[in-house]
Design a protein with these regions (language model features):
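Active-site acidic carboxylates
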Residues: 1-114
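Short Gly/Thr/Asp-enriched flexible loops that form oxyanion-binding sites at enzyme active sites
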Residues: 158-168
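Glycine-rich phosphate-binding loop at the start of an alpha helix
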Residues: 133, 155, 159
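Short, well-ordered beta-to-alpha junction loops that form the rim of enzyme active sites
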Residues: 69-72, 123-124, 152
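Glycine-centered short loops/turns at secondary-structure junctions
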Residues: 61-64, 143, 169
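Short, hinge-like loop/turn segments at secondary-structure boundaries
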Residues: 83-87, 139, 166-167
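Internal catalytic-core helix/loop-beta-alpha segment
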Residues: 101-150
Length: 169
């Protein structure tokens, strides 16, 4: 089957589909990141970085829009007003301040970083890439009706982002 035939059979209309990359930040997805001791084996075994990189390459070649939903980067005073904290927020407040603004751990992983012109949503502070961000407004403004969602961490930010997306108009 050639690519043109694949495009015609795709349930994802190119002009209305976006690849949403959630939390491709060094502390979460890169060797040497603070979450690597917990997630590194799985990331390597299932080739997470390689698969996301390949998907980015293909979607960019096809002209599919790419958007990013980054997690909040720690700054002095982060979460001072929150009554309840998620495990990631606790890790950000702990020693080393995971996902620190302006440090390697809070930067996008080099091979998964946004290209010029790709949308980077405002930072989400807990799990969903939609909660408290401008992501929904951007997707709506660009008439995006279909999402392909990849990134970190499946049972937290990916799941919450997908569940939120389904609930939106």
């Amino acid at each position: 089957m050639d690519n043109q035939e694949n495009d015609q059979k795709s349930p994802y209309p190119i002009g209305k589909t976006a690849l949403l990359v959630v939390d491709p930040l060094n502390d979460l997805i890169s060797e040497g990141g603070m979450a690597w001791p917990m997630a590194g084996t799985v990331i390597q075994d299932v080739k997470t970085v390689e698969h996301i990189h390949d998907l980015l390459k293909i979607t960019r070649e096809k002209g599919i829009k790419v958007a990013y939903a980054p997690h909040h980067r720690y700054r002095e005073g982060s979460y001072a007003e929150r009554k309840y904290l998620s495990p990631t927020q606790v890790a950000q407040l702990g020693p080393g301040h995971m996902l620190s603004q302006g440090k390697w751990g809070g930067d996008f992983a080099e091979t998964l970083a946004p290209k010029a012109g790709e949308f980077i949503a405002s930072e989400h502070s807990c799990s969903s890439g939609f909660a408290g961000t401008n992501l929904h407004a951007h997707l709506t403004e660009n008439e995006i009706t279909h999402l392909i969602v990849v990134g970190m961490i499946t049972n937290s930010c990916i799941e919450a982002t997908v569940r939120s997306a389904i609930d939106l108009d």
